[in-house]
Amino acid sequence: MASVTGTSISMASFKASLAPSRVSNLRSVSLPIKGKSFAPLRMRSARFVVCCAAKPETVEKVCAIVKKQLALPDDSAVTGESKFATLGADSLDTVEIVMGLEEEFGINVEEESAQSIATVQDAADLIEKLIEKKSG
């Protein structure tokens, strides 16, 4: 049994078929092993948030669209954590990225939602949310 409460931990399986999990804003972690319990690690934080990462395929598609829209070299490192601004995107580039995402995924991103997208992961999470909403 493991208990995790309120800064940030990332867990990933050794099996490639399983998607990584992320938990943000942890306060403590306790991992008892074979009947032995270790003192919990305590960290400063006021709240607990669980982030559900988008499917890796969605993140990969978003990375490809971002690379294309920003005319980045194929060997550019674009990941879920990549910020559009850090990649050199200005506001017009961001609008074009959102338009490319809408076309690729068959979704409509509202202006308020588009303004909240800062990273590739933000975009991928929003896309999956909109696809789920559209099909449900």
From Swiss-Prot:
All copies of domain Carrier, residue ranges: 56-131
Disulfide bond positions: none
Pfam family for this entry, one: PP-binding
O-(pantetheine 4'-phosphoryl)serine modified-residue sites: 91
GO CC field: chloroplast
Signal peptide from the UniProt entry: none
Gene3D superfamilies membership: ACP-like (1.10.1200.10)
Intracellular or extracellular location(s): Plastid, Chloroplast
Annotated pathway: Lipid metabolism; fatty acid biosynthesis
A molecular function (GO) term: acyl carrier activity
Transit peptide extent on chain: 1-52
Keywords carried by this UniProt record: Chloroplast, Fatty acid biosynthesis, Fatty acid metabolism, Lipid biosynthesis, Lipid metabolism, Phosphopantetheine, Phosphoprotein, Plastid, Transit peptide
Similarity annotation: Belongs to the acyl carrier protein (ACP) family.
Biological role: Carrier of the growing fatty acid chain in fatty acid biosynthesis.
Entry protein name: Acyl carrier protein 1, chloroplastic
Species of the source: Casuarina glauca (Swamp oak)
Gene: ACP1
